């Protein structure tokens, strides 16, 4: 429980001073789920909040794992998703629109990572028993982020046949 309060205070101070994606994500989570982003999701399961390890505890935790993987991909591309600011709107507390005004590819992709996470959360059951979950109980193999990558067949256009392999 002590870890939860430390993380909540840290997240609260980061979110209150950030001018980027973390504030955008907080606004999205709260508008769409009706829950406090900090009190309900920081420290939920094994992946919601900072870091993560082990097997995700439930569907909400899987949403957070996927979001961590999405951010890792952005870091690998040289983006700074915790602080990259993007423009978005939320319509009817359910529809998130990433604005065409977003200037950089990093801004656009960060918005999409956050949007996909919040849409994922919207369709899952929140379990109080995983709020403030101690990571000492996060055991088992850590799922590889490659599980979220589309198979090669989905990358090609549907109206084109894949190129035949080159002869040896």
UniProtKB/Swiss-Prot annotation:
Glycans are attached at residues 92, 102, 123, 144. Residues 1-20 form the signal peptide. Keywords: Calcium, Cell membrane, Disulfide bond, Glycoprotein, Hydrolase, Immunity, Innate immunity, Lipid degradation, Lipid metabolism, Membrane, Metal-binding, Secreted, Signal. Pfam families: Phospholip_A2_1. Optimum pH is 7-8. One of its GO terms (biological process) is phosphatidylethanolamine acyl-chain remodeling. Disulfide bonds join 46-138, 48-64, 63-120, 69-145, 70-113, 79-106, 98-111. Its cofactor is Ca(2+). It comes from the Eukaryota. PROSITE patterns: PA2_HIS. The keyword Lipid metabolism applies. Ca(2+) binds at residues 47, 49, 51, 68. It catalyses: a 1,2-diacyl-sn-glycero-3-phosphocholine + H2O = a 1-acyl-sn-glycero-3-phosphocholine + a fatty acid + H(+); 1-hexadecanoyl-2-(9Z-octadecenoyl)-sn-glycero-3-phospho-(1'-sn-glycerol) + H2O = 1-hexadecanoyl-sn-glycero-3-phospho-(1'-sn-glycerol) + (9Z)-octadecenoate + H(+); 1-hexadecanoyl-2-(9Z,12Z-octadecadienoyl)-sn-glycero-3-phosphoethanolamine + H2O = 1-hexadecanoyl-sn-glycero-3-phosphoethanolamine + (9Z,12Z)-octadecadienoate + H(+); 1-hexadecanoyl-2-(5Z,8Z,11Z,14Z-eicosatetraenoyl)-sn-glycero-3-phosphoethanolamine + H2O = 1-hexadecanoyl-sn-glycero-3-phosphoethanolamine + (5Z,8Z,11Z,14Z)-eicosatetraenoate + H(+). InterPro entries: PLipase_A2, PLipase_A2_dom, PLipase_A2_dom_sf, PLipase_A2_His_AS. The active site is at 67, 114. One of its GO terms (cellular component) is plasma membrane. Residues 139-168 are annotated as: Required for localization on the plasma membrane. The keyword Transport does not apply. Expressed at high levels in placenta, testis, thymus and at lower levels in heart, kidney, liver and prostate. Highly expressed in rheumatoid arthritic tissues, including synovial lining cells in the intima, capillary endothelial cells and plasma cells. Binds 1 Ca(2+) ion per subunit. Secretory calcium-dependent phospholipase A2 that primarily targets extracellular phospholipids. Hydrolyzes the ester bond of the fatty acyl group attached at the sn-2 position of phospholipids (phospholipase A2 activity), the catalytic efficiency decreasing in the following order: phosphatidylglycerols > phosphatidylethanolamines > phosphatidylcholines > phosphatidylserines. May play a role in lipid mediator production in inflammatory conditions, by providing arachidonic acid to downstream cyclooxygenases and lipoxygenases. Belongs to the phospholipase A2 family. This is Group IIF secretory phospholipase A2. It comes from Homo sapiens. The lineage of its organism: Eukaryota, Metazoa, Chordata, Craniata, Vertebrata. The gene is PLA2G2F.
């Amino acid at each position: 429980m002590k870890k939860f309060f430390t993380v909540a205070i840290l997240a609260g101070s980061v979110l209150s001073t950030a001018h980027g994606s973390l504030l955008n994500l907080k606004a999205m989570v709260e508008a769409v789920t009706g829950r406090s982003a900090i009190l309900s999701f920081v420290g939920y399961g094994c992946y919601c909040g900072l870091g993560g390890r082990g097997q995700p505890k439930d569907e909400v935790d899987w949403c957070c794992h996927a979001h961590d993987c999405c951010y890792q991909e952005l870091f690998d591309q040289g983006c700074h998703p915790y602080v990259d600011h993007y423009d978005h709107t939320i319509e009817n507390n359910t529809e998130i629109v990433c604005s065409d005004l977003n200037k950089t590819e990093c801004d656009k992709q960060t918005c999409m990572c956050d949007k996909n996470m919040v849409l994922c959360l919207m369709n899952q059951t929140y379990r109080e028993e995983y709020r403030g979950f101690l990571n000492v109980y996060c055991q088992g193999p850590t799922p590889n982020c490659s599980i979220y990558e589309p198979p090669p067949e989905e990358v090609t256009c549907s109206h084109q046949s894949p190129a035949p392999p080159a002869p040896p």
